[in-house]
Curated annotation (Swiss-Prot):
Residues in compartment: Extracellular: 25-1082
Cystine residue pairs: C57-C109, C153-C204, C262-C310, C352-C401, C445-C494, C536-C591
Tissue note: Expressed in the fetal and adult brain as well as in Schwann cell culture. Also detected in adult peripheral tissues.
Protein location: Cell membrane
PROSITE patterns, per database record: FN3, IG_LIKE
Intervals, Cytoplasmic compartment: 1104-1208
Biased composition (Polar residues): 1149-1161, 1194-1208
Complex formation: May interact with L1CAM. May interact with ITGB1/ITGA1 heterodimer and ITGB1/ITGA2 heterodimer as well as with ANK3.
Native species: Homo sapiens
Protein name: Neural cell adhesion molecule L1-like protein
CDD domains for the chain: FN3, Ig, Ig3_L1-CAM_like, Ig4_L1-NrCAM_like, IgI_2_L1-CAM_like
Signal peptide: 1-24
GO biological process, one term: cognition
Family of the protein in this entry: Belongs to the immunoglobulin superfamily. L1/neurofascin/NgCAM family.
């Protein structure tokens, strides 16, 4: 594949070079030459709507040409001051101002120098007038219902194209159909009018897009009078009009669109059909439009000329019209005259041929004048050629060939330059070239020489010119070196020589390494809907890396750059990824590399695997009572061999429509003999399997029905259902419909006591259950069940042992003792129940126990029975998870499949003391530079008499080392806090607290805190403020500093604050202002009013709290929930609020401005004096051992606030 692509790229490059090398001779601008027009306006220029219009004419030549114009064949001078000529060209502009209609006409540009004159084609400049409908009074039209009528439009003339519309005054289009039609001229035809056609606002609009103009005809009124007798009539052509006769001629230019239209009046409305007389309408280019009234043929050719017939018909008759179509063509070049360069004394021919219909006439001009005015000795002028002999420099001229017929004129200029000059090499000296090893190199040496010159190439270090099959020199001087090697690198010289002189240039050639590619993985096999990942590894010459571009294609079609199908295909440079591959993604993938000098490619074959197609054409043969042959045809395997076939059947009377697997067949086989059961109406289907998965099932086969037979098997799983004592309910698995083998299925059940010398009892039933009464409880029986149907009995059944129904145990176990293992675990032992008193199959023993009272406080406990079962025959069991230091009652009973027997007499035992649980909380409520005060809550479960606490602490500064653990035994169990002294300043400590009983200490609760620094000023304390006070003076040591003020109740739990604020004191220069205000009478009165109101609110608050009023805990929990506090909430004594984790509702800014919402803010209570009583949620006093909160701020339903003006 790679050589193929390389070769293809080489061919394209060679074709480009050949076109480059075979172009017309380009005379260097330094050589004298006749003028050549290189740019001109279109042959028709319409008046534009821009600020000016421009007619272009540009030419080249040596000497520089001068320009002149003619208008309508007469010289045109730029005398009008509005004309703006361009420098160095013949282009001029006319501003769009004033009256410019006199500029309309046909212009021609002439470019001349001393050697000749070139002329442009005629440029028609059109200044259209603004089209208008004439102002006229249009008489109303009145017709009878069913009559035909034509509404004329007669649009004004204007610059084409013209678009005509019929609308009403509301600019709604008049609906056209088989009855109503607008002709190409714009007239509106009615084949027969109806009453609904009456209206007074039929308006014809003419639109001229190039003029950006739409004009409207005066509205027309049409009245349709209803008629009681509408006469039907045969068709009559209205278009073409009657005066044109039964046939007409139309001339159309080749390549244009032919439109033939036919419209007939009549009632019922005639239908129009088209045909070509003596031929067929051109397929693919003809269409019938406007309900068949218009025949449209696009891109008309000479084959379309001839006679076309339209036929309008209804059931009363027909009307026809023939169109004779003539196809003509404006002139077009078949041999356009070509410019040429000749040397003195040479000969030449100038050819000019054109075709058209009618045949164009040819006229020759020399320098814009008829050729007859410029006779040259030896020249022969024919209608289609001029023959030159012994050319001389004075033959240099511009020859014009003009071809014309009735449809237009075309003009071509051909320069004849007679010059003698030594070679002029156009390629720059010292040009650098590069190619790739194995590719061809092209070294250019473009030149101009007259007379003709000889070109030779040689390597700079060599004397002889290059020769051999690897070298080729083109006519324009380019050297081609085929199949380059590294030895071809170097400098080359190009020599060009003619009769007048010799010239040379040098060129340098570099040889690069070829680009290489490798696509991986090679030929992958990908399951459908998996991901395909291809990688393209490239290697190229270091000089070419900047130009290296990779692209991907599939089966020769390139992928888009950014992928397709909503990102399913992603191309990222060298990587191609396709998600959810489908069978359409299978193919040959090619990675192509292109550099500035070469290209390379590599391919990989991607195979997509899928499940097979379903098998087809299922056929049944060799039909037998117990077998049939099934044959099928394999479907497509989708690139993965079929490993096996699964044959399924449907025929189960119990589950119709359910398919079951019958057998499996190896993938190479497509036929199998299927074993069948009697009395089944079978239908089969086949599923193919390959490594990807299963196919869809095939279409079902024909039905095959087998005859009935006696049962082949007996019921299985014979058992006893739970039943009453002295009763045996025998059950078994009934035979499925596929196992019954025939109609009338029944079951013969026989039984007898096991080992008893009695006859078998027997009963036949149709269902799969039989109830048998027995004289004994839980006695063994031999039981047999046999299947029978109308065709006979099944095989002899095997006997099974079943037991009659159980009864409850009638004796309770006797408890021998309860051994206490520890405070929460005991071992119970009992005597087993005799087998004959179990009355069934013993399943185990059950222990019931319940707590009667706590030994800690002596309170009785409501009976809540706990149950623990032990399976099997045993006489002891362990009872865990008991409460320590408590009294329990315990009973034991036996149970079988029927149920539980009687309980034993209750056994009373007590559990000893255990270790307590951890305290409910531990917090540091006060800290200084060398002391700390800790407070804690009572454990939720004491598990005995509390003897005290073990407090431990150690230094845990932010290092890997920790300090020595210090122990403090607190022997006062009622003490809820402890004051530590002799701590280090600015040090972080970790505290551990355990509650203890006589059995030891429980799990610790921990807390961390840091002491203050040496320079800390601590907390300023204020003496008590009574309820009637509204202000209190505070001495401030630093005027202008911020101070935190918190107001607390004296005896509330944890010294909860009811107000806090951050206040900035002023400097001393403002002290007088506050002194003066405080002595004013109005200020004293205001403060008294505020104090009275505050006292009233606080009194209400305290009364509500003492009466158990609830404050909004839920509201505060919703503001800032704390998951850690929430998890602990249910484990503490009683209820408590975590509102200390949230700011007080209605309070001002936080004490610590940097504190996060979920952090706890320190309260002044941490630094308060003495112990503080605790309140429960309802505000009542609990005492030292009541449930407590870690931190809290009390919120009442109507919270009070207080202000504290400071005086500096």
């Amino acid at each position: 594949m790679e050589p193929l692509l390389l070769g293809r790229g080489l061919i394209v490059y060679l074709m480009f070079l050949l076109l480059k090398f075979s172009k017309a001779i380009e005379i260097p601008s330094s050589v004298q030459q006749v003028p050549t027009i290189i740019k001109q306006s279109k042959v028709q220029v319409a008046f534009p709507f821009d600020e000016y219009f421009q007619i272009e004419c540009e030419a080249k030549g040596n000497p520089e040409p001068t320009f002149s114009w003619t208008k309508d064949g007469n010289p045109f001078y730029f005398t009008d001051h509005r004309i703006i000529p361009s420098n160095n060209s013949g282009t001029f502009r006319i501003p769009n101002e004033g009256h410019i209609s006199h500029f309309q006409g046909k212009y021609r540009c002439f470019a001349s120098n001393k050697l000749g004159i070139a002329m442009s084609e005629e440029i028609e400049f059109i200044v259209p007038s603004v089209p208008k409908f004439p102002k006229e009074k249009i008489d109303p039209l009145e017709v009878e219902e069913g009559d035909p009528i034509v509404l004329p439009c007669n649009p004004p003339k204007g610059l084409p194209p013209l678009h005509i519309y019929w609308m009403n005054i509301e600019l709604e289009h008049i609906e056209q159909d088989e009855r109503v039609y607008m002709s190409q001229k714009g007239d509106l035809y009615f084949a027969n009018v109806e009453e609904k056609d009456s209206r007074n606002d039929y308006c014809c609009f003419a639109a001229f897009p190039r003029l950006r103009t739409i004009v409207q005809k005066m509205p027309m009124k049409l009245t349709v009078n209803s008629s009681n007798s509408i006469k039907q009539r045969k068709p009559k052509l209205l278009l073409p009009p009657t005066e044109s006769g039964s046939e007409s001629s139309i001339t159309i230019l080749k390549g244009e669109i032919l439109l033939l239209e036919c419209f007939a009046e009549g009632l019922p409305t005639p239908q129009v059909d088209w045909n070509k007389i003596g031929g067929d309408l051109p397929k693919g280019r003809e269409t019938k439009e406007n309900y068949g009234k218009t025949l449209k043929i696009e891109n008309v050719s000479y084959q379309d000329k001839g006679n076309y017939r339209c036929t309008a018909s209804n059931f009363l008759g027909t009307a026809t019209h023939d169109f004779h179509v003539i196809v003509e063509e404006p002139p077009r070049w078949t041999k356009k005259p070509q410019s040429a360069v000749y040397s003195t004394g040479s000969n030449g021919i100038l050819l000019c041929e054109a075709e058209g219909e009618p045949q164009p006439t040819i006229k020759w001009r020399v320098n814009g004048s008829p050729v007859d005015n410029h006779p040259f000795a030896g020249d022969v002028v024919f209608p289609r050629e001029i023959s030159f002999t012994n050319l001389q420099p004075n033959h240099t001229a511009v020859y014009q060939c003009e071809a014309s017929n009735v449809h237009g004129t075309i003009l071509a200029n051909a320069n004849i330059d007679v010059v003698d000059v030594r070679p002029l090499i156009q390629t720059k000296d010292g040009e650098n070239y590069a190619t790739v090893v194995g590719y061809s190199a092209f070294l250019h040496c473009e030149f101009f020489a007259s007379p003709e010159a000889v070109v030779s190439w040689q390597k700079v270090e060599e004397v002889k010119p290059l020769e051999g099959r690897r070298y080729h020199i083109y006519e324009n001087g380019t050297l081609q070196i085929n199949r380059t090697t590294e030895e071809d690198a170097g400098s080359y010289s190009c020599w060009v020589e003619n009769a007048i002189g010799k010239t040379a240039v040098t060129a340098n050639l570099d040889i690069r390494n070829a680009t290489k590619l490798r696509v991986s993985p090679k030929n992958p096999r990908i399951p459908k809907l998996h991901m395909l990942e291809l990688h393209c590894e490239s290697k190229c010459d270091s000089h070419l890396k900047h130009s290296l571009k990779l692209s991907w294609s599939k089966d020769g079609e390139a992928f888009e750059i950014n992928g397709t199908e909503d990102g399913r295909i992603i191309i990222d440079g060298a990587n191609l990824t396709i998600s959810n591959v489908t069978l359409e993604d299978q193919g040959i993938y090619c990675c192509s590399a292109h550099t500035a000098l070469d290209s390379a490619a590599d391919i990989t074959q991607v195979t997509v695997l899928d499940v097979p197609d379903p098998p087809e054409n299922l056929h049944l043969s060799e039909r037998q009572n117990r077998s049939v042959r099934l044959t099928w045809e394999a479907g497509a395997d989708h690139n993965s061999n079929i490993s096996e076939y699964i044959v399924e059947f449907e025929g189960n009377k119990e589950e119709p429509g359910r398919w079951e697997e019958l057998t499996r067949v190896q993938g190479k086989k497509t036929t199998v003999i299927l074993p069948l059961a009697p009395f089944v109406r079978y239908q089969f289907r086949v599923i193919a399997v390959n490594e990807v998965g299963r196919s869809q099932p095939s279409q079902p086969s024909d039905h095959h029905e087998t005859p009935p037979a006696a049962p082949d098997r007996n019921p299985q799983n014979i058992r006893v259902q739970a039943s009453q004592p002295k009763e045996m309910i025998i059950k078994w698995e009934p035979l499925k419909s596929m196992e019954q083998n025939g109609p009338g299925l029944e079951y013969r059940v026989t039984w007898k006591p096991q080992g008893a010398p009695v006859e078998w009892e027997e009963e036949t039933v149709t269902n799969h259950t039989l109830r048998v009464m027995t004289p004994a409880v839980y006695a063994p029986y031999d039981v047999k069940v046999q299947a029978i149907n109308q065709l006979g009995s099944g095989p002899d059944p095997q006997s099974v042992t079943l037991y009659s129904g159980e009864d409850y145990p009638d004796t309770a176990p006797v408890i021998h003792g309860v051994d206490v293992i520890n405070s929460t675990l005991v071992k119970v032992t009992w005597s087993t129940v005799p087998k004959d008193r179990v009355h069934g199959r013993l399943k185990g023993y059950q222990i019931n126990w319940w707590k009667t009272k706590s030994l800690l406080d002596g309170r009785t406990h409501p009976k809540e029975v706990n149950i623990l079962r032990f399976s099997g025959q045993r006489n002891s069991g362990m009872v865990p998870s008991l409460d320590a230091f408590s009294e329990f009652h315990l009973t034991v009973l036996a149970y079988n499949s029927k149920g539980a027997g009687p309980e034993s007499e209750p056994y009373i035992f007590q559990t000893p003391e255990g270790v307590p649980e951890q305290p409910t909380f531990l917090k540091v409520i006060k800290v200084d530079k060398d002391t700390a005060t800790l407070s804690w809550g009572l454990p939720k479960k004491l598990n005995g008499n509390l003897t005290g606490y073990l407090l431990q602490y150690q230094i845990i500064n932010d290092t890997y080392e920790i300090g020595e653990l210090n122990d403090i035994n607190i022997t006062t169990p009622s003490k809820p806090s402890w004051h530590l002294s002799n701590l280090n300043a600015t040090t972080k400590y970790k505290f551990y607290l355990r509650a203890c009983t006589s059995q030891g200490c429980g799990k610790p609760i921990t807390e961390e805190s840091s002491t203050l620094g040496e320079g800390s000023k601590g907390i300023g304390k204020i003496s008590g403020v009574n309820l009637t006070q509204k202000t209190h003076p505070i001495e401030v040591f630093e005027p202008g500093a911020e101070h935190i003020v918190r107001l607390m109740t004296k005896n509330w739990g944890d010294n909860d604050s009811i107000f806090q604020d951050v206040i900035e004191t002023r400097g001393r220069e403002y002290a007088g202002l506050y002194d003066d205000i405080s002595t004013q009478g109005w200020f004293i009165g205001l403060m008294c009013a505020i104090a009275l109101l505050t006292l009233l609110l606080l009194t209400v608050c305290f009364v509500k709290r003492n009466r158990g009023g609830k404050y909004s805990v839920k509201e505060k929990e919703d503001l800032h929930p704390d998951p850690e506090i929430q998890s602990v909430k249910d484990e503490t004594f009683g209820e408590y609020s975590d509102s200390d984790e949230k700011p007080l509702k209605g309070s001002l800014r936080s004490l610590n401005r940097d504190m996060q919402p979920t952090e706890s803010a320190d309260s002044l209570v941490e630094y308060g004096e003495g112990d503080h009583g605790l309140f429960s949620e309802d505000g009542s006093f609990i005492g030292a051992y009541a449930g407590s909160k870690e931190k809290g701020s009390v919120e009442s339903n109507g919270s009070s606030t207080a202000t504290f003006p400071l005086r500096a």
